[in-house]
Amino acid sequence: MSRRHRAVKRQVEPDIRYKSPLVAHLVNVIMKSGKKNLAQRIVYGAFEKVSEKLEKGDPVDLLLGALENARPRLEVKSRRVGGATYQVPIEISFERQESLALRWIVDAASGRKGIPMKEALAAEIIDAYNNTGNVVKKKEDTHKMAQANRAFAHLRW
């Protein structure tokens, strides 16, 4: 990792159907081995299921609501001081909050065995939108860990 200068953030192209960079990011998180077409089918199928179940209109707005409930504000990073390693709580940027929330939603969906991925993804989005489920629990666990290690906040770098 070069320390000369920060890498330039590249713009994610909006997806074809919803014209949203957020949906394109979700597709990229789901994609494995370059199979973008399959990832798009999974995401669009999940959005159709979410629209059917919640009947609230635009699935992108529902995804935004789910992300708002799943987005962590703090996380802990290991910091070695002397011979001891401390878990230091730090605030995280909006981009990282969004990326973590999307990754957690996809991981929780793939953890639901026995049902197709598009249905699992739809269920996770609905659970996160309703402030329940594995993703919200993971966020709360992360916040609890940061709260428990608040005494080491002065070691922030």
UniProtKB/Swiss-Prot annotation:
Organism: Opitutus terrae (strain DSM 11246 / JCM 15787 / PB90-1)
Family: Belongs to the universal ribosomal protein uS7 family.
BP-aspect Gene Ontology terms: translation
Keyword Transmembrane part of the UniProt annotation: no
UniProt keyword annotations, A-Z: Ribonucleoprotein, Ribosomal protein, RNA-binding, rRNA-binding, tRNA-binding
Quaternary state and interactors: Part of the 30S ribosomal subunit. Contacts proteins S9 and S11.
A Gene Ontology term for the protein's cellular component: small ribosomal subunit
SUPFAM superfamilies xref list: Ribosomal protein S7 (SSF47973)
One Gene Ontology molecular-function label: tRNA binding
Name this polypeptide is given: Small ribosomal subunit protein uS7
Pfam families documented for this protein: Ribosomal_S7 (PF00177)
Database matches in InterPro entries: Ribosomal_uS7, Ribosomal_uS7_bac/org-type, Ribosomal_uS7_CS, Ribosomal_uS7_dom, Ribosomal_uS7_dom_sf
Role played: One of the primary rRNA binding proteins, it binds directly to 16S rRNA where it nucleates assembly of the head domain of the 30S subunit. Is located at the subunit interface close to the decoding center, probably blocks exit of the E-site tRNA.
